[in-house]
């Protein structure tokens, strides 16, 4: 399995948050694609 993206801290910038959500969505796509 690919590594799960690290969640940014409480003081993360909106830029970091959007990058985290983008990588999290990519990670979930990889994981669900491998499952089926």
From Swiss-Prot:
Chief location category: secreted
Pfam families per UniProt: Hormone_3
Keywords, alphabetical: Amidation, Hormone, Phosphoprotein, Secreted
Location of this chain's protein in the cell: Secreted
Molecular function GO terms recorded: hormone activity; neuropeptide Y receptor binding
Xref: SMART domains: PAH (SM00309)
Phosphoserine modification, residue list: 13
Residue(s) carrying Tyrosine amide: 36
Protein purpose: This gut peptide inhibits exocrine pancreatic secretion, has a vasoconstrictory action and inhibitis jejunal and colonic mobility.
Name assigned to this protein: Peptide YY
Lineage of producing organism: Eukaryota, Metazoa, Chordata, Craniata, Vertebrata
């Amino acid at each position: 399995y690919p590594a799960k993206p690290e969640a940014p801290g409480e003081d993360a910038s909106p830029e970091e948050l959007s990058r985290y959500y983008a990588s999290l969505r990519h990670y979930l796509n990889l994981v669900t694609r491998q499952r089926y």
